[in-house]
Design a protein with these regions (language model features):
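A short acidic-to-branched-hydrophobic micro-motif
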Residues: 217, 247-263, 288-297
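Polar low-complexity intrinsically disordered regions enriched in Ser/Thr and small residues
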Residues: 245, 252-253, 273, 301
Length: 309
């Protein structure tokens, strides 16, 4: 790399993490040159394209995010003399020739500890499984999915009240600074970027969809049910899992929020023991829980609104 010129990077990004990376890179003491941002455009629909809007405000060039699947992008990156390709919360599979195009390498910010939590929606899976700790990993990109060598990893506790959104937020808060650290080290001496091979014998891969096809079973212990509900809770945003569905008083609805009571259940699992303005008290395999909010036909409801005679 020519010492006189700044580090040249391309960012593939979505969501709040992508916005924070763009702003933070430009605020570094020696900011890299952001050659382009690849992100979803408003024309593609879906959630608000916050990275697209941020890139526009910052005056950055925007390229279609879908182009990462084409080898044509590799030539474009080489012609632009790109040093780093940074993937932040974009789910497109990147063509191998694109990964190999940057002079230094391509990197991914993954919201989970590797190799134990590879795949999609892993903050939710961690809560569902009852993990006591979680992590965020910055790693080199290779031809596999979340298999590349680790650059840095931050681990942290999972609180008993963490929702899917809360745990994802922790990943962003601790993970985004790793991207800034990478840019700083790469600009100084790229040979100092760590490259720790993963122990793939410990690898577990998680799919995007929810466990049990999104069905909640009242015959499970209360703790397992509450973890499922919290894992799917991304309010006020849409949940990638939806809300776990259950039969309650003859109605099938998503359980959006629930809480423990610590009271032993003596009734059959699924029995509504009490129904008032605070929610529906429901029996599980071992304890009573309070179902506080349901989801049906695109809106949230109090159980009393749906279940009262």
């Amino acid at each position: 790399m020519v010492a006189e010129r700044r580090l040249r990077v391309v960012v593939i990004g979505e969501e709040a993490a992508g916005v924070q990376v763009l702003r933070g890179l430009m605020a570094l003491p020696t900011p890299p040159e952001i050659v382009a941002v690849l992100t979803r455009s408003p024309a593609e629909g879906g959630a608000r394209p916050v990275v697209y809007e941020s890139a526009q405000k910052l005056g950055l060039d925007i390229w279609p995010s879908s182009s990462v699947r084409s080898p044509d992008l590799a030539m474009r990156l080489r012609n632009a003399e790109v040093d780093l390709l940074m993937n932040v919360h974009s789910l497109f599979l990147i063509h191998p020739s694109v990964l190999a195009a940057p002079a230094i390498g391509s990197f991914n910010l993954h919201p989970g500890p590797l190799p134990e939590y590879a795949g999609l929606n892993v903050p939710s899976w961690a809560i569902y499984e009852g993990a006591r700790s979680h992590g965020v990993t910055l790693h080199w990109l290779d031809d596999g999915i979340d298999t590349g060598p680790i650059v840095w990893q931050e681990r942290f506790d999972v609180d008993s009240t963490d929702t899917g959104l809360a745990l994802s937020g922790k990943c962003v808060r601790l993970g985004v600074p790793l991207v800034f650290r990478l840019a700083t080290v790469a600009a100084t001496d790229a040979r100092l970027i760590p490259r720790e091979q993963q122990d793939l014998s410990r690898r577990r891969y998680f799919s995007a969809g929810p466990p049990a096809e999104g069905r909640l079973d009242w015959a499970q212990p209360a703790d397992a049910i509450l973890r499922f509900v919290r894992a799917a809770d991304y309010a006020p945003f849409d949940s990638p899992w939806g809300h776990p569905r259950a039969q309650l008083g003859g109605v099938k609805a998503g359980v959006a929020k629930a809480a423990a009571t610590g009271v032993a259940a003596t009734q059959p699992a699924g029995t509504i023991v009490e129904l008032d303005d605070s929610g529906a008290v429901v029996a599980t395999a071992d304890e009573l829980i309070v179902v506080q909010r349901l989801w049906l036909d695109g809106r949230y409801l109090k159980p009393k609104e749906l279940l009262a005679d």
